[in-house]
Swiss-Prot record:
GO terms for molecular function: GMP reductase activity. This is GMP reductase. InterPro entries: Aldolase_TIM, GMP_reductase, GuaC_type_2, IMP_DH/GMP_Rdtase_CS, IMP_DH_GMPRt. The active site is at 174 (thioimidate intermediate). It comes from Helicobacter pylori (strain J99 / ATCC 700824).
Length: 325
């Protein structure tokens, strides 16, 4: 197997067939819905909140609400249903999450999307949760993860998952690769390619995205959707503390397995960093959209399918993907 990551690969351009990059269509379909771009902000507390989720849904973007305020999920789903917006939430696998799924079914609430979100998704507990959701809420589109092998993808698909999330520890505030010795950090793009070859259903690439060009690379190597954390951190709308240093504003960004999220120093696989304030989320989304349109034009097509067919070169290798602990 070839081992490489985002910074090791360059895509090779094809003849441009559009008069303007603005003609290029970045639309993607996931389940029963079409979205403006194949991107989704990470379901982390410093990346997504209810107001951001509503903004994204109103404007045709996919989102996944985090699971770290469990009691707010049912009111959130009700609110999104009332507003006729897409409802997309996360669950874990503990006993209280099983009860939560039962409560959704009891109230007749069917979220459009449920993401089963744990660090090591190739597990019996995730398989059982997939089956539970599919039994109680059969119309819900189930995303399961995170995984890093073809075996895991096929097993979760066979259990009933409608999509799998690929990536074990490549994120900017994840230190799984250093703390445990396991994961896809440093070879996330190759892991995506490996998993995509086995997949029969959509894959969401999760982690390791450092530039907008990495979105196109993810599409090339098999992703239907790309989950992004650090590029969506530090915005005006983002949750988390703000601090000023030497006249420059910074916002906190921490991992879901960090002590800042857990509230205790136990089984820590995440850290906190401070991101320079980036201004409005809307502006970042516009720039991301324009850059992806440019990627399509370089691929020689009019839509995302063109990116899947381009050739590529491997230019170097860097095991830590630019990160330090």
């Amino acid at each position: 197997m070839k081992v490489f990551d985002y910074e090791d690969v360059q895509l090779i351009p094809n003849k441009c067939i559009v008069n303007s990059r603005s003609e290029c269509d970045t639309t993607v379909i996931l389940g029963k819905h079409a979205f403006k771009m194949p991107i989704v902000p990470a379901n982390m507390q410093t990346i997504i909140n209810e107001s951001i989720a509503e903004f994204l849904a109103e404007n045709g973007y996919f989102y996944i609400m985090h699971r770290f305020n469990g009691s707010a999920r049912i009111p959130f789903v009700k609110k999104m249903k009332e507003r006729q917006l897409i409802s997309s939430i996360s669950v874990g696998v503990k006993k209280e999450e099983c009860l939560f799924v039962e409560e959704l079914a009891k109230q007749g609430l069917t979220p459009d999307y449920i993401t089963i979100d744990i660090a090591h998704g190739h597990s019996n507990s995730v398989i059982e949760m997939i089956q539970r959701i599919k039994t109680r809420l059969p119309e819900t589109f189930v995303i399961a993860g995170n995984v890093g092998t073809p075996e895991a993808v096929r097993e979760l698909e066979n259990a009933g998952a409608d999509a799998t999330k690929v990536g074990i520890g490549p994120g900017k505030v994840c230190i799984t690769k250093i703390k445990t010795g396991f994961g896809t950090g440093g070879w996330q793009l190759a892991a995506l390619r490996w998993c995509a070859k086995a997949a029969r259903k959509p894959i969401i690439a999760d982690g390791g995205i450092r530039t907008h060009g990495d979105i196109a690379k993810s599409i090339r190597f098999g992703a239907t959707m790309v989950m992004i954390g650090s590029l969506f951190a530090g915005h005006e709308e983002s949750s988390g503390e703000t601090k000023i240093e030497n006249g420059i504003a910074y916002k906190e960004y921490f991992g879901s397995a960090s002590e800042f999220q857990k509230g205790e120093k136990k089984n820590i696989e995440g850290k906190k960093i401070w991101i320079q304030h980036k201004g409005s989320l809307k502006n970042t989304l516009i720039e991301m959209h324009q850059d992806l349109q440019s990627s399509i034009s370089y691929a020689g097509g009019r839509d995302l399918e063109a990116i899947r067919k381009v050739d590529y070169v491997i230019v170097k290798n860097s095991i830590f993907n630019g990160d330090t602990i």
